[in-house]
Structures are given as structure tokens and as C-alpha cells.
């Protein structure tokens, strides 16, 4: 069965690209036609590309690989958080802090600070500190949680990035390139597909389109990790039978 159907893509508006004056000629191979000054993406190609990306993410996750979901534009923020959490992966949905990948040690220090503040709140330290100090510490904790909450359990660099709108997330793309981390991305008609390892040609501005495609990448992880659990159970059962 296909990973995604033309009907699903059409209903979510994945085929609507940008205005014809705002385009990247390299996306020509993924464009079906032009209608009322807007490029229409070739959904037959999108179906194939979603499948390629899905298979890549599934295999990566099955091998224990970790994916970082990145989407900081308003239309992507909720989907990125919800879908990454659903499949147990990491996410950044507010602002990409420069050096998140290339200066990972410094980011880790800020994450350690966040965890320390959370522990202080949990163990009652805040209750014995002066009120003014607690207000400042809570503000600091909220700010760190806002920007780093989605990666606070990421103890090493991710094995792949899933990005919504590579133009908007160009710093993340550049950092991933520098570290040879593969990139899967929703690529609209105004983006450069050559920067992306697994291109998903599609509308990166409509909430429904973003939700659908992000959900499919999360599904790939869920399929891989739940399958791994079943396999482990089967192995355990076989071991029990042979040792009995």
C-alpha cells in the first residue's frame, strides 16, 4: 500500500506552490503547471518522494537513529511539536539557535542549566529562596524551555533532520551540511532542492499540508520503533522456548 495517496495530498493543498514570480528554477522538475499566477506542484512526484523519505526515516529509526524535526514558522510550530513528541523524537519549533549542531557542547551546557532549574523547582529549592530571585529563575527556566525543551533529552547529534521550509531554516541546513547530517525536507517552489538529500515537493505554508507530511515522517518512526519492539518480544519468546 502506498505511504500517501493523491487524494490526501490534494485535500491538504500540498499541490499549491508559490507565486510564479517567487520561484527557484531548480524546482522546475517538480512543477506540473501554472494556474492564476501560482505554480502547481506535480503530486505524482510528491507521492514518490514521500515514499523515498518515509523509507529512509523508517530504516534510520529501525537502526536506533534519531531525527530532529525543525519548523519554526508559525504554520509549522504545532505540527512539529505534536508529531515529534508522538514518535519520540526531538524538535525545534521556536527559533533555531546558531550553533545548535555545530556548537553542540555549548547548547548542552544551556540544557544542563535548564535541567538544574527544573530540579530546583521540583525539590523545593525555590520555596526557600527570596521571591525576587525565584521570579528571575523561573523566567530563565521558561525561556530555556521555550527554545530548548524539544531537544533537552538529545544527548548527541541527530542522525537526520526533517525540515519544513529550508529557506526559512537556512542556518539549520548549513549546520547539517557542515556535519554531513542528511536532510529530509518539505521543499516549496521557492526553495533550492539541491541542498536537500530527500526532497518532498510540497506546500510549506498551509497548516494542513505541513501537518500531513510531518505526520507521515512521524509514522515512519512509529512503524520502525513499534516493529522493533515486536521483534524484541519475538526474540525473547524464542529464547524462552529454547531454554525451557
Swiss-Prot record:
The gene is rpsB. SUPFAM superfamilies: Ribosomal protein S2. Keywords: Ribonucleoprotein, Ribosomal protein. This is Small ribosomal subunit protein uS2. InterPro entries: Ribosomal_uS2 (IPR001865), Ribosomal_uS2_bac/mit/plastid (IPR005706), Ribosomal_uS2_CS (IPR018130), Ribosomal_uS2_flav_dom_sf (IPR023591). It comes from the Bacteria. The keyword RNA-binding does not apply. Coiled coil: none annotated. One of its GO terms (biological process) is translation. NCBIfam families: rpsB_bact (TIGR01011).
